[in-house]
């Protein structure tokens, strides 16, 4: 197979992941094209053959995208919605308004937070502020400079977890849900034509949350092109914090 189209969400996180996967394809002499997708476009793009490889789907949340004409491969990183704070705190179920004064939640994590707050009555009355994923670092830097004490809810990986702003807050009851698996969805007709060594390499490819947070930071905060960030990863120049 000489050409493959990668579909991915338009965020810096997913663009970085797609570019890293493209590096593996190109090493096997596969020409790569990219298609940016809105979340509501993914299912149609797969069904209509507009993309050959979706990078990436978060399982089990995105199982609906893996129909009978597709093959699910790999385990690139492990997304998880997490509680965090600007300083070390005890487990989330022990916190009160004496410990935190507000909740700042990334937009993609809001639904999970609203469910969790039903089991956290001591925190449910706190003011909630929803911010876009791209605006989270700036908002937390402002909170830090103004002496605020927010409880933060965001999905790892994210650039904010590369910026050394946050300490994770333990969630012993997994109120935000458990760890997911970022996997690739390959059209079955494409998989049958693909080189078996390539499929094996994609299946074994591991980026991990720290690398993905670093990629997200390089692209979303430092403004690097996703291909340049992927090259830095491939050449070992991308160093995750606390690696």
Where are the model-predicted features located?
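Short, well-ordered beta-strand elements
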Residues: 1-13, 30-35, 100-104, 202
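An extracytoplasmic/periplasmic, membrane-proximal ligand-sensing/linker region
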Residues: 2, 135-145, 152-154, 158-161, ...
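Ligand-binding cleft/hinge of the Venus flytrap
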Residues: 20-28, 97-99, 105-130, 232-235
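Short beta-strand->loop
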Residues: 70-77, 153, 163-178
